[in-house]
Amino acid sequence: MQIRVSDEGAARDCLLVLGWGNRCRHRNVQWLIDQLATAYRVHAVELPTHITDYRAEWVEPAQEYAADLGAFDLLGHSAGGLTAAHLDADGVGNRVYLSPWWDTDLPVPQSVLDAVASLPITRPFIPINTLDADAIGDLATARQLAEGPSSVSPAFLRTVLRAQRSLPPARDTAAAFCSLTDTVVDPRAVGERLSADRIRLYDGGHELFSSSGREDTVELVLDALQHGPDAL
């Protein structure tokens, strides 16, 4: 896990847990960091890609880092939203989730997915062909797409399913942004965990920050992050 700090002199801290394959060097991720940096000292967490234990490799390292921050607000995107939902630190203030990976709508029966996930294999060999610009967002760059994950292992699927099935109750300070046309994660899982007044929809792909309508929504993201779901 890599954590990069953007400090423009803001007094408040934001822990930004990026999605699966997101890196700070990607132009659209940097755009999001720049927006947050107008109000926060941003601690951007880059999650490791091929894992076998979500708690040991995603949640616990982020939680250990967060313990040293004091008070902070929390923003998680996709797999970062899954990780952030499990994060329990004394200093957490408001929580905002962007297209959180709380469930996946795959074109296979759940029994088949569970069978594949049960295989004792850690090598990523199952191809992923859905993470293109149509799915991610119309502003997705060639570099961003080329550097994204192209396969997963059964062990990865197994630990992600465990993370999704063991989510703690949503906190009162949580809000979420998602697109109903998201083909990467299942937006219905957001509606199952948060009431409608704590959810805002946007037009675009899985990544708000890689979608051309991002300018219309990012101020509301900042409002929810700074002031909580009542700001929506």
Where are these regions (language model features)?
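Glycine-rich phosphate-binding loop signature in dinucleotide/nucleotide-binding domains
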Residues: 9, 67-70, 169-170, 228
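Alpha/beta-hydrolase active-site loop
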Residues: 49-69
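The alpha/beta-hydrolase serine catalytic core
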Residues: 94, 98-173, 178-185, 191-205, ...
